[in-house]
């Protein structure tokens, strides 16, 4: 009878990547590893072209973890990737909104060990609100192995755009003249100010 191995999850990803900025982000920025992420979010293995790591946000002292371009998507088809170890937090949620706005990214990918329910809900809401091609993804990173094999990464997509729902609700979100309704505009303004507030308090 054939002996089979057993999949085992590596609970501490820091045993493989000691730090998010020093180890995980440089690892992910390599073409082979970006191909894994690109496939997970549905762009295909050659769907992302790496443009830079620690990309400065114009007019500020902040840097986005990774900036890519969707292959074949044109000059403005930018993809922002923000990484976080541990559980997602309000600070990183504010960062991705600020970075996406400053860099004019159409696609935003938040990667963490655990994406909290309230942050999933916020990104789902943004996907439902967006009518200009902007897309938000949230991904939980895991490591697995079989016996003594090399660790293997797994990207679990927990938030992704629902294009069918977006098309169905687009008319409801917009007023007759094509602009956001006052209620939707108020919510969008709130999240924008929330991100700006988090940035202003950083380093205090």
Q: Predicted regions: what is each one?
A:
Residues 1-204:
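Charged, terminal alpha-helix-loop-beta segments
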């Amino acid at each position: 009878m054939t002996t089979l191995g057993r999949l085992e999850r590596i609970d501490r990803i820091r045993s493989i990547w000691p730090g998010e900025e020093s180890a995980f982000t440089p690892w992910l920025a390599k073409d082979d590893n970006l191909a894994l992420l690109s496939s997970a979010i549905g762009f295909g293995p050659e769907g992302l072209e790496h443009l830079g790591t620690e990309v400065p946000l114009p007019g500020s002292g902040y840097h986005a973890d990774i900036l890519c371009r969707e292959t074949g998507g044109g000059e403005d088809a930018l993809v922002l990737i923000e990484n976080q170890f541990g559980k997602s937090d309000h600070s990183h949620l504010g960062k991705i909104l600020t970075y996406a706005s400053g860099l004019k990214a159409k696609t935003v990918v938040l990667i963490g060990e655990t994406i909290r329910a309230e942050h999933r809900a916020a990104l789902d809401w943004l996907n439902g609100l967006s009518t200009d091609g902007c897309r938000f993804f949230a991904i939980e990173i895991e490591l697995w192995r079989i016996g003594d094999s090399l660790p293997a990464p797994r990207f679990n997509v927990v938030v992704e755009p629902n294009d069918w729902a977006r098309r169905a609700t687009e008319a409801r979100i917009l007023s007759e003249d094509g602009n956001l309704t006052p209620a939707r505009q108020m919510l969008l303004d709130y999240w924008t100010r929330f991100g700006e507030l988090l940035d202003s308090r950083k380093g205090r």
